[in-house]
C-alpha cells in the first residue's frame, strides 16, 4: 500500500510540475489563465488555435505536448487511485477511518499503511504530533501561547489531513453535521484561515486515531444550532 501511495504522490507532483510549466509558458507570452484547473484544461485548445498572434507554431507544439503529458498523468493517477480504492474496500480499518468527516480512501489507506492499528501511539495527540500538526507552545508569564505547527514527522500524511480540513472549511453549511460544528464556528471567528485549517487537521487526525484504535466507526453528535 505504501508503494502505491509513493507512486501516486510522485505522479501528482509530476502533474503539478507540468501544469505549472504550461501556465508559465503562456504567461511569458501574455496569456493569463485563471487558477481553476478545469478552466485551463477546457481553454487550452482554444488558446493554441486562436492565439497565434503570440504563440509561434513551435511554442504551440511544445504546449500541446505538455497537455498530452498532463492527460497521460491523469490516466495513470486514476489507475493507481482505483487500485488503492479496491484495497480499501476489503480493509476494515480503512473503512472505519473513512467514517471521519473529510477522510476518503486516500487518507484512510495512507494512515493505515503508515501506522497499522495505531497502538504505537499512546494517545491521539501523540499521533498528531508525529504528523507535525501540534502547534508549538510558548510561555510568557502565566500565559501559554500557541504558535505555528511544527511541520515535523510524516509530511505526506500531514498534507493529506490539511487537504481534508480545507475541503471541510469550504462547506460551512455542513459543519453542524460533523459533530464539531460549534467548535468550528467559534474557531473560525477568531483564527486566521490557515491557522484554522491546521487546527481542524489536528482535530481530524486525533479523531481518526481514536476511531482506528477503538475499532469503531465515527458517530457525529449533530449540532442543532451553531450560531
Name every feature range the model reports, one short phrase each.
Residues 96-99, 105-193, 227:
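Phosphate-backbone recognition surface of nucleic-acid-processing proteins
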Residues 76, 80-83, 87, 114, ...:
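Generic, well-ordered alpha-helical scaffold segments in large soluble proteins
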Residues 21-27, 35-40, 84, 140-143, ...:
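Short coil/turn segments at secondary-structure boundaries
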Residues 1-96, 225:
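Glycine-rich, often acidic, oxyanion-interacting loops/wings at catalytic, nucleic-acid
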Residues 142, 182-227:
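Low-complexity, acidic/Ser/Thr- and charged residue-rich accessory regions of DNA metabolism proteins
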Residues 25, 110, 160, 164, ...:
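Amphipathic alpha-helical segments in well-ordered regions
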Residues 18-19, 77-80, 116-120, 166-175, ...:
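Short helix-capping/linker segments at secondary-structure and domain boundaries
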Residues 11, 73, 104, 127-128, ...:
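Short, conserved catalytic/metal-binding motifs centered on acidic residues
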Amino acid at each position: 500500500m505504501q508503494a502505491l501511495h509513493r507512486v501516486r504522490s510522485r505522479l501528482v507532483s509530476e502533474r503539478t510540475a507540468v501544469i505549472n510549466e504550461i501556465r508559465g509558458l503562456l504567461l511569458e507570452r501574455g496569456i493569463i489563465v485563471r487558477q481553476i484547473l478545469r478552466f485551463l484544461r477546457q481553454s487550452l485548445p482554444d488558446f493554441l488555435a486562436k492565439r497565434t498572434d503570440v504563440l509561434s507554431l513551435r511554442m504551440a507544439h511544445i504546449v500541446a505536448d505538455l497537455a498530452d503529458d498532463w492527460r497521460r498523468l491523469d490516466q495513470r493517477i486514476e489507475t493507481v487511485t482505483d487500485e488503492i480504492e479496491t484495497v480499501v474496500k476489503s480493509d476494515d480499518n480503512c473503512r472505519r477511518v473513512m467514517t471521519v468527516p473529510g477522510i476518503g480512501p486516500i487518507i484512510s489507506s495512507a494512515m493505515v499503511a503508515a501506522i497499522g492499528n495505531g497502538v504505537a501511539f499512546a494517545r491521539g495527540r501523540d499521533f498528531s504530533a508525529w504528523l507535525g500538526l501540534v502547534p508549538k507552545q510558548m510561555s510568557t508569564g502565566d500565559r501559554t501561547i500557541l504558535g505555528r505547527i511544527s511541520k515535523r514527522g510524516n509530511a505526506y500524511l500531514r498534507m493529506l489531513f490539511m487537504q481534508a480540513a480545507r475541503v471541510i472549511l469550504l462547506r460551512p453549511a455542513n459543519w453542524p453535521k460533523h459533530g464539531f460544528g460549534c467548535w468550528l464556528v467559534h474557531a473560525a471567528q477568531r483564527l486566521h484561515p490557515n491557522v484554522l485549517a491546521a487546527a481542524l487537521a489536528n482535530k481530524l487526525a486525533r479523531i481518526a486515531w481514536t476511531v482506528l484504535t477503538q475499532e469503531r466507526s465515527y458517530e457525529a453528535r449533530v449540532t442543532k444550532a451553531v450560531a
